[in-house]
């Protein structure tokens, strides 16, 4: 999983996934260098901000929002709040 500081310019430069014959890869993740646990999921048709944290060996991942509907800065703030809730043991799926 590549790591980079998620900015508008960098996100715009990341291409959507192209379907290739025989490939089962349908998504790619990019981690943010500024906020551990925050990242971008790229598919064939969308770029989604995600937050993820491993708790007791189980990976918890949630979608923060879709780019460009929300900016990287807005998504980073939401992700920071979500990571805080996860650290406190609050269920983010409720």
Per-region residue spans from a language model:
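Basic/aromatic DNA-contact patch characteristic of tyrosine site-specific recombinases
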Residues: 1-94
């Amino acid at each position: 999983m590549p790591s980079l500081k998620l900015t508008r310019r960098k996100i715009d430069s990341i291409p959507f996934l192209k379907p290739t014959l025989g490939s089962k890869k349908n998504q790619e993740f990019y981690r943010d260098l500024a906020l551990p646990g925050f990242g971008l999921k790229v598919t064939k048709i969308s770029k989604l901000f995600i937050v993820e944290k491993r708790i007791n060996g189980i990976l918890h991942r949630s979608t923060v929002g879709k780019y460009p509907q929300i900016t990287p800065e807005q998504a980073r703030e939401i992700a920071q709040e979500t990571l805080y809730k996860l650290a406190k043991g609050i269920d983010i799926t409720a």
